[in-house]
Curated annotation (Swiss-Prot):
Protein name: Kinetochore protein spc24
Annotated family: Belongs to the SPC24 family.
Flavoprotein found in the keyword field: no
Protein localization: Nucleus; Chromosome, Centromere, Kinetochore
TM helices/strands, residue ranges: none
Pfam families tied to this protein: Spc24
Task of the protein: Acts as a component of the essential kinetochore-associated NDC80 complex, which is required for chromosome segregation and spindle checkpoint activity. Required for kinetochore integrity and the organization of stable microtubule binding sites in the outer plate of the kinetochore. The NDC80 complex synergistically enhances the affinity of the SKA1 complex for microtubules and may allow the NDC80 complex to track depolymerizing microtubules.
Lineage: Eukaryota, Metazoa, Chordata, Craniata, Vertebrata
Record carries keyword Isomerase: no
Keyword list, A-Z: Cell cycle, Cell division, Centromere, Chromosome, Coiled coil, Kinetochore, Mitosis, Nucleus
Highest taxon listed in the record's lineage: Eukaryota
Gene: spc24
GO biological process, one term: cell division
Alphabetical list of InterPro entries matching this protein: Ndc80_Spc24 (IPR013252)
Subunit architecture: Component of the NDC80 complex, which is composed of ndc80, cdca1, spbc24 and spbc25. The NDC80 complex interacts with mis12 and zwint.
Amino acid sequence: MLCEQIKEYVDVSREIVKVMVSDSAAVALKKSLDRQEAMIDLLLDTETEASQLIRDFMAVEEKVAQTLLDTEETKQKTSSKLQKIERELQEKIEKNSSLESGIKFLQKELEELKMMEEEIADMEREADEDTTTVIPSAVYLAKLFHNVTKIDWDYNCDPSLIKGIHYGGEIAQPISIDSNQHSKIFICNYLWSLLSTDW
C-alpha cells in the first residue's frame, strides 16, 4: 500500500512540473494540488492508525503478561495448599479411620482445589491463545512499517510532537517536529524527504 502511495506522490509531482513548464490552465494545477493534499491526508491517517495499533499492541501485551503473572502466582499458592491438604488427609486416614466427617470435608476441599487448578490451566491456555493470535499480527504490521520507513517512533512523547530516529542514511538522524507549528503538508514532505527512492 505504501509503495502505491509513493508512486501516486511521484505521479502528482510530475504533473505539477508539467503544468509549471507548459503553462497549462489553472484547473489542471488545482486538480494536481487537490490530489496531492488528499494523498498527504491519507499518509498522515495511515501513520496515526499505525501508532494506535502499536499502542494497542503494547496494552494487550502488558495485559497478557500481567494475567500470566497473576495466574502463575495463584497456581503456586493453590499447588502448595493442595499438597498440604493431601498430607493432612493422609495423616487423618492413618491416625483414625473413624473420622469420616473430617475426611469427607478434606476430600471436598481437595476436589474444589482440583477444579480451581483446572480453571487456572484453562486461563493459561486462553492467555497463550491471545498471545499467539493478537500479538504476532500487530508485530508484523509494526515491523513492516519500520522496514519501509526506517524510522523508530517515540510513542511516549507529547501528542503534539512527532519524534523518532531515522536510520535510513549513513548516520542516524533524530526527528522532532511540533505539529502545532508546521502544516501537515510540511511534515509529510519532510518525512518523505528522509525516505530513500532506491528500490
